[in-house]
């Protein structure tokens, strides 16, 4: 009985961390590390892998938990979120807050410890990226912007770009502010499209609690056009790696990434065009469900290209 209760408690806190979100972010960190390793021929130690992946997982989970803690009042009202651990009473507010703070501290420590398996500079950058991501997501987005500004997810979405940069800097600081930054930019620019498609689908829920998500407060037609513009921007930015020349003079990516970015970009633009043509919750939901695999495919292509280089 005690064992079953313990397992149930672990499962509830795991659910509270919103794993579907941090799985994708951890994957982008993994993809950036694999790409950097392949490009520069740098072997990544098991310890570095563990510190990098677990720090990103803990940091992302922490942001989700602390955001849920702050939003527990509106989550109890919105149909989409009423069954989450906090509004359903399966986790206490104090328990959620303490769990989130523990994860935040653990993520910072693990990121800083990358200095022990690589260089002090790499560890310092990894810890700085974790700290910025937490600050931007929890304080800037959740506490300052989410309930006040229609552009909340734009300014509050910078945190999404941190996992790929952590993955890159755990391998090398070379081209961190070119290729590493562009990888982070892929997630940052992808975020509004992804979230706006979700909020269009659940616009009534967001309006019920007076959260001014851009695609919830505007008409469906205007919202659909905003989503389409952000989708086109994402598809165009996904071609940015093709413009980058690395420090050794070589191109950052090759034909595999070009073909993947072009094909997947055309598909997601077509889906956004469907949302414009038929601005319904169903169309927005289809775009939302496709957006995560789309981002994952881009990072897979980056890894494959880097592997072919090696």
Curated annotation (Swiss-Prot):
CC terms in the record's Gene Ontology section: plasma membrane
Family in the record: Belongs to the UbiA prenyltransferase family. Protoheme IX farnesyltransferase subfamily.
Its biological purpose: Converts heme B (protoheme IX) to heme O by substitution of the vinyl group on carbon 2 of heme B porphyrin ring with a hydroxyethyl farnesyl side group.
Name of this chain's protein: Protoheme IX farnesyltransferase 2
Miscellaneous note of the record: Carbon 2 of the heme B porphyrin ring is defined according to the Fischer nomenclature.
Catalyzed reactions per annotation: heme b + (2E,6E)-farnesyl diphosphate + H2O = Fe(II)-heme o + diphosphate
InterPro entries (UniProt xref): Protohaem_IX_farnesylTrfase (IPR006369), UbiA_prenyltransferase (IPR000537), UbiA_sf (IPR044878)
Transmembrane segments: 21-41, 46-66, 99-119, 125-145, 153-173, 180-200, 226-246, 256-276, 284-304
Pathway info: Porphyrin-containing compound metabolism; heme O biosynthesis; heme O from protoheme: step 1/1
GO BP annotations listed: heme O biosynthetic process
Highest taxon, organism lineage: Archaea
GO molecular function: protoheme IX farnesyltransferase activity
Gene: ctaB2
